[in-house]
């Protein structure tokens, strides 16, 4: 297989036949069956003076096998120059043939595969997904209402927000991105109401809480607000600008900035692809610049932006557990032994990409495991004691290249963890994953799509629940008493803990809340995740005034 260096026109391959021959027919077998490849073929006797034989530089016809009659007398060398493809595939082919006579017949399986080539969209896009044992699965949303799903976030109360980018990773046309809001009003596991919540280019990461939707759409982090709760954003505020490079306009959103997750510590964590950024400006005017990839974090209001760690390639999400351990599926997929890594991310650590980790491993923070080829996408840590073991406390990572969602149950080992991975869900080209407050999981798929817009019938979203778990409606936290919020803050689900915390913080500081949080943090009978949530809530609620109580808590032998 030969592949162009990138999607830009001009990459070429030179073929030497060994001796000059009179060539009458040539044939290319391209990698993709649904690509309209654009190319030129030239011939030469001496590799200096070239004659144009085939010009398909403006081709729009979808064909995987492209035969051509040529008049190439006394030709030893051929040059195939790629000008890209529609959709935005890189030029790549399996085979180039040159014959002095007629073209030989191709093997039947090659002909059969190439006959799938067509300029028309597929008539069906039947979701290809294999649910894990012990789980119920429904197709929650699919075209035409929901297609090209890049990212998603589940509201605690069950609404699902899906980031749609018809331009994919390499398309550059503006006006093709949006976030849709999906509702299942009758509880059958399928969305029956879908509307556009907000429009923007290249949505890559979403967080929703209480009418507010944070959207990472490179080069911006924007807060969209639905103040009248009609399901459509009516206000927006730019929190961070320049959190990418100008390659968004030149190359598309690939390798720019990606998923976002909110931790119980009061920060939004941004997965930064390896193009980095050179003029990221927060809401408070703070400016950062750094090439490469890793994690940046920022407060929900766009202030205090800072680099958390660095030296990763194209991570698409940060998976945060209740104790603020962070894991990533590192898309270090350059080939030649540069593969998918699973990492425990530690603040200030350097993970070595691209300069160190292959040849100077002793100078970097090592990954927990290397899993070979793949294409890591969205991920999350999910803690919920209502789910059966081992599914209720683990890292879930999507791998687009391997068409699977993996479950990781990393076991503590000193200051870090031992790696673990098993296949959780077989699903075609998964892109993102999230869970709502009732314990319903959602996974999006890019099935049927390429690297930019090709046709409308692309992608779907599924919903999963354990068979022994009956989802209970998650309450409107704004209508709960403080006592009820404390129960959710220390409750079984990481999602519940976070959204209870956010409501407590909205209500503001008073003496009763401070005392209640100190009591929760001190109670050894409360699950550890709940006590940790109480400590982080206390600090965010009381600010510097929390120091005295935090010092007293640190004296307790069961608080470390």
Residue map of PLM features:
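Beta-propeller domains with acidic blade repeats across secreted/periplasmic ectodomains
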Residues: 30, 61-62, 106-487, 495-506
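Structural detector for internal amphipathic alpha-helices that build alpha-solenoid repeat scaffolds
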Residues: 472-475, 494-509, 529-543, 548-555, ...
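Amphipathic alpha-helical scaffolding segments comprising HEAT/armadillo-like alpha-solenoid repeats
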Residues: 479-487, 509-522, 542-554
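Cysteine-rich, disulfide-stabilized extracellular repeat modules
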Residues: 9, 13, 22, 46-49, ...
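Disulfide-stabilized cysteine-rich extracellular repeat microdomains
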Residues: 22, 46, 55-58, 85, ...
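Aromatic, loop-rich ligand-recognition surfaces of beta-strand-rich domains
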Residues: 1-112
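Residue-level detector of buried hydrophobic side-chain packing
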Residues: 15-17, 26, 41, 80, ...
């Amino acid at each position: 297989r030969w592949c162009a260096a990138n999607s830009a026109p001009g990459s070429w391959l030179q073929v030497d036949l060994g001796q000059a021959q009179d060539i009458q027919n040539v044939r290319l077998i391209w990698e993709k069956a649904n690509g309209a490849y654009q190319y030129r073929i030239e011939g030469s006797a001496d590799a200096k003076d070239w004659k144009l034989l085939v010009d398909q530089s403006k081709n729009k016809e979808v064909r995987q096998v492209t035969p051509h009659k040529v008049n190439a007398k006394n030709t030893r060398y051929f040059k195939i120059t790629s000008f890209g493809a529609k959709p935005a595939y890189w030029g790549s082919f399996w085979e180039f043939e040159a014959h002095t006579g007629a073209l030989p017949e191709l093997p039947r399986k090659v002909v059969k595969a190439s006959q799938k080539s067509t300029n028309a969209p597929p008539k069906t896009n039947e979701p290809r997904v294999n649910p894990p044992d012990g789980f119920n699965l429904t197709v929650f949303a699919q075209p035409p209402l929901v297609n090209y799903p890049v990212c998603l976030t589940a509201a605690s109360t069950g609404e699902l927000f899906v980031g749609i980018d018809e331009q994919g990773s390499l398309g550059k046309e503006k006006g093709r991105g949006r976030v849709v809001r999906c509702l299942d009003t009758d509880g059958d596991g399928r969305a029956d109401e879908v509307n556009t919540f907000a429009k923007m280019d290249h949505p890559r990461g979403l967080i929703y809480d209480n009418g507010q939707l944070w959207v990472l759409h490179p080069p911006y982090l924007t807060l969209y607000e639905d103040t009248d709760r009609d399901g459509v954003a009516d206000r927006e505020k730019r929190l961070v600008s320049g959190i990418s490079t100008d390659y968004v306009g030149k190359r598309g959103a690939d390798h720019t900035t990606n998923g976002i997750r909110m931790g119980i510590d009061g920060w939004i964590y941004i997965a930064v692809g390896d193009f980095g950024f050179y003029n990221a400006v927060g809401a408070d005017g703070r400016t950062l610049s750094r090439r490469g990839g890793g994690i940046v974090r920022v407060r929900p209001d766009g202030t205090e932006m800072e680099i958390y760690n660095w030296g990763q390639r194209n991570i698409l999400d940060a998976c945060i557990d209740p104790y603020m351990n962070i894991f990533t599926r590192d898309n270090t997929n350059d080939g030649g032994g540069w593969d998918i890594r699973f990492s425990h991310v530690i603040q200030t650590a350097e993970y070595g990409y691209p300069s160190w980790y292959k040849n100077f491993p002793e100078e970097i923070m090592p990954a927990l495991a290397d899993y070979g080829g793949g294409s890591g996408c969205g991920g999350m840590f999910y803690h919920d004691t209502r789910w059966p073991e081992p599914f209720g406390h683990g890292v879930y990572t999507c791998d687009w290249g391997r068409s699977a969602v993996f479950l990781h149950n990393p076991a503590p080992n000193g200051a870090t963890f031992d790696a673990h991975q098993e296949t959780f869900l077989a699903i075609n080209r998964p892109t993102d994953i999230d869970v709502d407050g009732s314990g319903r999981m959602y996974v999006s798929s890019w099935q049927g799509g390429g690297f930019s817009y090709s046709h409308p019938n692309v992608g779907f979203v599924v919903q999963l629940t354990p068979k022994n778990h009956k989802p209970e409606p998650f309450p409107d936290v704004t209508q709960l008493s403080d006592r009820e919020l404390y129960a959710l803050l220390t409750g079984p689900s990481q999602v519940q803990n976070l959204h209870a915390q956010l409501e407590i913080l909205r209500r503001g500081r008073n003496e009763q809340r401070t005392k209640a949080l100190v009591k929760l943090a001190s109670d050894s009978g409360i699950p550890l995740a709940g006590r940790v949530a109480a400590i982080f809530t206390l600090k965010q609620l009381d600010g510097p005034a929390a120091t005295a109580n935090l010092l007293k808590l640190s004296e307790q032998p069961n608080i470390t």
